Each structure stands twice: as structure tokens, then as C-alpha cells.
Amino acid sequence: MRTSQYLLSTLKETPADAEVISHQLMLRAGMIRKLASGLYTWLPTGVRVLKKVENIVREEMNNAGAIEVSMPVVQPADLWQESGRWEQYGPELLRFVDRGERPFVLGPTHEEVITDLIRNELSSYKQLPLNFYQIQTKFRDEVRPRFGVMRSREFLMKDAYSFHTSQESLQETYDAMYAAYSKIFSRMGLDFRAVQADTGSIGGSASHEFQVLAQSGEDDVVFSDTSDYAANIELAEAIAPKEPRAAATQEMTLVDTPNAKTIAELVEQFNLPIKKTVKTLLVKAVEGSSFPLVALLVRGDHELNEVKAEKLPQVASPLTFATEEEIRAVVKAGPGSLGPVNMPIPVVIDRIVAAMSDFAAGANIDGKHYFGINWDRDVATPEVADIRNVVAGDPSPDGQGTLLIKRGIEVGHIFQLGTKYSEALKASVQGEDGRNQILTMGCYGIGVTRVVAAAIEQNYDERGIVWPDAIAPFQVAILPMNMHKSFRVQELAEKLYSELRAQGIEVLLDDRKERPGVMFADMELIGIPHTIVLGDRNLDNDDIEYKYRRNGEKQLIKTGDIVEYLVKQIKG
């Protein structure tokens, strides 16, 4: 490709509305342009990267035995009504009617469509297992699209769905998809972790996220410093302290705390160690409970894990925090004065709270706290559960090492769905025993456009993008200095361009009438891994300057050796 016949579209300045580095660099490198909120046009450089990602995904899915299909973006509403997700999905599901007033949706995912297809196409267990995938545009009407293509409304996704007659068969395919995803992200040169995850609104029994580690990530990824343990923070277990609870050394005292309505204020005003405080959060109880609310207690420096809390049998789903009005109606005190002593509703405490002694908490009286509280002396030990987020330094749940926490960008997610959708849509086949058998399903997604942004978040410097070789838009840039004035530079540039292309190498020849500084800046901005610079001064010595983008190292290579050298660098 020649720049004179290409839409390079680089920008010198960073657009003001671009928050994260990937969004900034994708705009500056001429990869994308914003059409409307959460909607982007992909320009040639962006498409080249996108296709590289797509091809790796497609190759590994095919290698894993998955079969490619293509399903409509527009889906009839009756399928979503049949599955029960028409009401559940919320405003992210874009709904519309056609000219015949028939309701449809723009597909954010395709569980319903693929299950409908399979219930009409398959009839016997002999046809299974099967795993279908597509790489296709999806639409989710995000309330606040942000971070460029990281959280856009329209995006490209690889979604796959497998069908089975047994849990054992599903587990085999799930393991194969786990391995395929690991190969996909390894081939792309990404630093990632596969982590245990919550199944969320998709449903099902088991789930793993594939997280690219990056400071701009929206998720907290937890992993052991010693073992292979890794989990999303929502699912990471906070194990109980091994040490027994210390004996009481203080009497429980009622203290006036009129200006301490938060843990931070309590700690500051009374010089308390934060690890000797407990905060109390009230949430709505499950429907049909004899109590309207449930009290959840965590240590003052810890955060409630809402996913864990929602799974408590006495807690309503979705988890809903009580309003001040609801709290006062039950406890007769405000949110800043709550605690376990004389709490008139069920109480669940975190494992580490159960191991505390001589701690401070609200007295359930406005402007008052109890100091020196001890379990079983001042208040009976209530139900104990793991309801907090882990923190860095906690022991790993597998007993090996301690936990580290880094930010991550979710680029892939695999689920064991079980029979959630097949039961709702009555997808079944004749089993080996001749009886009708509901199918067991798995689903497996990769955010293809998000992978591009995540790769940039992990691979950039002050000059621009530093692409991993496997997904770079071009492999080699040829920069001929003053080629329009120097015949030998022009002749050599054309010769190398032809020879490299003949070797199957993707080359960008910068044949613009531009200053050298502009040419260098553009090639570094778009992140081409290998650059060769042709100039009269070096050619006097039969040399060509070679530069590797990732480490910035330069070296002189003889003209006759440069093609062989580049082929070796790229193809190994």
C-alpha cells in the first residue's frame, strides 16, 4: 500500500472528548471517527487491525471444531418474550416496530435466535454436540457510551453457542473454548488473565472472563502471586481468618458521636483504628420475608461485595439498598448510626467481622455509637458469610500465596448456560433412551472491537501505538527520504516495496511529498513494528537504517541483506 493511495488521516492534536489512551490514539492514528454517541466509522487503518483480530479469532474457533454461521441483527420480539428476557433486559435492548406494527429488537446477543434455529433443525442426540459461532455487529443502547469503542453502542462481537445432551459433553466443549480463547489472546500478544466470574444476567452455572490487564480497565482482577488462582473481584473468596478471635479487653460503652456519620469521621474524631470499626448496610429482604430489611456488616475499611450479598437467601434480588426513610421506619435511627446491638432485623456479618473484638459500631440511636463491642457478650454472633471484596494482601483462597489486584478490560467471557434458554424455548432432541431431552447449552463471547482498544491500552508510548506484531495494520513501513528528488532512493524504494510484497509482507510505502519529521511521526503514531529509512547519505555506504518500533533500537543493514533480514524478523 502507498500512502498516496491511502487514507492515512492522522491527527496531531488529541481530541478533547477522548478520555482514555486507546480512544485518543485510535482517533489520532486515523483508525476511527465518531458518527454519533457510541457509534464509530472504522477507517482503513482501523479495519486492517480489526480484520487481523477477526482472522485470529476465526482460525482458532475453526481449529476448536466450531462451525461458522450468520444470524440476523434484527430479531422478532416474540422470541425474547418466549425466553422471558423481553422484560428482564432493560433499556439497553433497542426495541422497534416495522411498518406492519410487528415488534422487533436490534440484537445485543443471540441466545434466543440460535436456540430457535436448533429446536427446528435438530431431532436426535446423534447430531450432537455442536458448537456454532458468528462474528457480527451487535447493538446495546448504553446509557452512557464512553471510552471510544471500549464501551460503544454498536460493536463487533464473536458469539458462539454449543448444544449438548449431558453436562460432561458441555464441560468438554467449555474446556476446548477456554483453551481456544487462551490461544487467541496469546497469539495477539496480550497480557491477560482467565478469571472465575459471576454469570450475571446471562445465567448459568459456571463462567470465566478473559481480562486484559491495563490501568484503564473497569474491572478489578484478582490473582495469586504464587499459584494459577484468578477471579473477578465479584467472585473472589475472602477466606476466614485463621487466628482465633482475641479476648475482650474493653467494656461496651455508649458514646455520643453527633458529628460522626461516616466511618471516616468516626476514625478521625475519636482516633480509632479503622480496623476496629464496623459499618452496617441495610438492604431489602427477599419477598415474603417476615422482615422488610436485612443488615449486612463489614469491617470499616472493607467494601460490601454486592454480588455475594445478593446471593444470600434472605436478600432480595436485585440487591436494593434501603432508603433513609425505610431505615428509620424499622430501626428508628439514620444510616450513620447503625450497628448490631439491638438491631431489630436479621443480621449477616462478614467472616472477618466475626473474628473482631473490642470494635466500634453504631448504637441504632441517632448520634451515638457503642465502643468496645464483643460478640456473644454484648450481642449474639449472627449469621456469618463471605460478603466483602477481597483486598490486596489477603491470602489466596487456594491456600497458595497472597492476592494481587490489577485493573482489567474484559475482552472475552465463556458461560455454562445449562438449560436456561433451551427450557424456555423448549429446545429438545430424542435422547439415547428414546425420551425427549432438553438440550444443555454453553455460550462464548469475544468483543472483537474491544480487543483492539484493549491491545492499545497495553501497548503504547509517548509517540503512539506499539502494536503487537500479529495485529499491526502493516508489518513494514518504507520511508524514502526526498524520493521525489533522488532517483536512486525512489528506485530502491520501489524495488524493496515489490520484493517485500512478493514475500507476503504487508508494506506501507510513504511516498508523500512530506517532511521527514512528519513521516516519522505518522509511522510511529500508527505503530508499524518495522521501519526502514532510505536516504542518500546511508546509501553512499550501501546501508539502510532499520528501526524496531517496540524498543526504538536502530541499526544499519546492508542494502542487499535488508529483505532477508525483514523476512527473518517477521516470519522467524
Curated annotation (Swiss-Prot):
InterPro entries (alphabetical): aa-tRNA-synt_IIb, aa-tRNA-synth_II, aa-tRNA-synth_II/BPL/LPL, Anticodon-bd, Anticodon-bd_dom_sf, Pro-tRNA-ligase_IIa, Pro-tRNA-synth_IIa_bac-type, Pro-tRNA-Synthase_IIa_type1
Gene3D superfamilies cross-referenced by the UniProt entry: Anticodon-binding domain, Bira Bifunctional Protein, Domain 2, YbaK/aminoacyl-tRNA synthetase-associated domain
Entry keywords, A to Z: Aminoacyl-tRNA synthetase, ATP-binding, Cytoplasm, Ligase, Nucleotide-binding, Protein biosynthesis
GO biological process: prolyl-tRNA aminoacylation
Gene Ontology MF terms: aminoacyl-tRNA deacylase activity; ATP binding; proline-tRNA ligase activity
Top-rank taxon, per record: Bacteria
Cytoplasm as UniProt keyword: yes
Enzyme Commission code(s) on record: 6.1.1.15
Catalysis performed (reactions): tRNA(Pro) + L-proline + ATP = L-prolyl-tRNA(Pro) + AMP + diphosphate
One of the record's GO cellular component terms: cytosol
Pfam families: HGTP_anticodon, tRNA-synt_2b, tRNA_edit
Compartment annotation: Cytoplasm
Record remark: domains: Consists of three domains: the N-terminal catalytic domain, the editing domain and the C-terminal anticodon-binding domain.
Subunit structure: Homodimer.
Sequence similarity: Belongs to the class-II aminoacyl-tRNA synthetase family. ProS type 1 subfamily.
Function: Catalyzes the attachment of proline to tRNA(Pro) in a two-step reaction: proline is first activated by ATP to form Pro-AMP and then transferred to the acceptor end of tRNA(Pro). As ProRS can inadvertently accommodate and process non-cognate amino acids such as alanine and cysteine, to avoid such errors it has two additional distinct editing activities against alanine. One activity is designated as 'pretransfer' editing and involves the tRNA(Pro)-independent hydrolysis of activated Ala-AMP.
HAMAP family in UniProt: Pro_tRNA_synth_type1
Name under which the protein is recorded: Proline--tRNA ligase
Gene that encodes the chain: proS
